[in-house]
């Protein structure tokens, strides 16, 4: 497949993300409600993707976000710097000292174990990035003057506020103006859309955004809720994806949105919180490519696995243009990311490629 990427020589960044980055507070093996200490990480649905591109795949990336200008914001910046992601595009917003004007988001997340599923409890109302408008970012400068080869954003950020919807559209329209490839993860969260118009608003916004997207990421529920497409013959409990039905739906979506060059989703069957069957598929040029199956994958922390899949997928598409190879990069990277704590990857490209090639868990000496 030909994505017609901008040459690296004319762009400062290989990839940038647009979205919220939160402080993740992790009680480890315990529960949020009984914790006496938390381990801190950074994470965000859009940011995790470009963080993986930088840390695992050594691409030059930056994050477009906003923080309240206080100690917590500086902690977040420090985490991002440790991941190697450029912080020069962060908007720092004045605060009144108690968070009435704006604040930084918190995400309390339990990993789950066995029959006890993972639990997320986010505290993200009135955050700096949710209050940001298109005027807070100079997209002409970012995509025109600096140059960006790939923009990744998604439905979690779009659902934060009315302003977020507008900011996503402004960013992707400017990105397309300068030839930047756009990927978008639908990532439908009913609770996030409920305050700004519910599913009707989600469809209104996502149908407009979809007109500018080159690589769309989303499962069957996302496509139904956000874009109004249905899969025939799918399991009512959404435990197993009907691949023939998914392919038919994607072909229909591609007719509606001929700008789609690739569509991808992970395939996850939850046995327990710590054992999942895992794979992924990618549609491109009318064909469906399925990644290697990871049956009975043992998981330490599932949060961010889908974002790490997207990192590998984007890397594969950017460097090879081969959808089959790209979806295998994505599935392997996502699988490895779920074997370590935190939202973001601790894997190397060498490890990803070894897993793709069938390597096991023998001791490396």
PLM region spans:
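Positively charged, low-complexity intrinsically disordered leader regions
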Residues: 1-33
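Alpha-helix C-terminal capping segments
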Residues: 41, 48-60, 82, 316-319
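Active-site nucleophile and cofactor-binding loops and adjacent substrate-binding regions
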Residues: 37-47, 65-69, 91-101, 301-305, ...
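Conserved phosphate/ATP/ADP-binding segment of small-molecule kinases
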Residues: 189-287
């Amino acid at each position: 497949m030909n994505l017609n990427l901008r040459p690296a020589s004319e762009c400062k960044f290989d990839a940038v993300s647009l979205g919220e980055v939160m402080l993740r507070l992790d009680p480890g093996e315990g529960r949020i409600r009984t914790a006496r200490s938390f381990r801190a990480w950074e994470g965000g649905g859009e940011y995790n993707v470009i963080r993986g591109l930088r840390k695992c795949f050594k691409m030059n990336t930056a994050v477009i976000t906003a923080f309240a200008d206080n100690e917590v914001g500086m902690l977040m910046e420090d985490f991002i710097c440790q991941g190697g992601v450029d912080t020069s595009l962060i908007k720092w917003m004045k605060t009144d000292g108690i968070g009435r004007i704006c604040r930084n988001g918190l995400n309390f997340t339990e990993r789950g174990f066995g029959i006890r599923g993972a639990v997320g409890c986010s505290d993200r109302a009135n955050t700096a990035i949710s209050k940001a408008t298109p005027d807070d970012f100079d997209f002409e400068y970012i995509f025109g003057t600096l140059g960006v080869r790939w923009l990744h954003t998604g439905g979690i950020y779009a659902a934060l506020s009315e302003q977020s919807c507008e900011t996503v559209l402004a960013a992707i329209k400017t990105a397309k103006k300068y030839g930047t490839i756009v990927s978008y993860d639908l990532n439908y969260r009913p609770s996030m859309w409920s305050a700004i118009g519910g599913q009707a608003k989600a469809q209104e916004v996502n149908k407009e955004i979809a007109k500018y997207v080159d690589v769309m990421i989303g499962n069957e529920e996302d496509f139904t809720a956000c874009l109004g497409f249905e899969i025939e013959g799918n399991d009512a409990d959404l435990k197993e994806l009907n691949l023939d039905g998914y392919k038919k739906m994607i072909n229909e979506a591609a007719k509606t949105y001929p700008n789609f060059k690739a569509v991808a989703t992970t395939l996850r069957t939850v046995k327990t919180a710590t054992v999942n069957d895992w794979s992924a598929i990618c549609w491109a040029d009318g064909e469906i490519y399925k990644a290697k199956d990871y049956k009975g994958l043992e998981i330490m922390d599932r949060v961010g696995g889908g974002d790490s899949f997207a990192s590998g997928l984007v890397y594969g598409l950017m460097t090879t243009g081969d959808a089959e190879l790209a979806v295998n990069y994505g599935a392997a990277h996502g699988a490895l990311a779920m074997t370590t704590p935190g939202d973001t990857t601790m894997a190397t490209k060498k490890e990803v490629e070894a897993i793709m090639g069938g390597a096991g868990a023998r001791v490396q000496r």
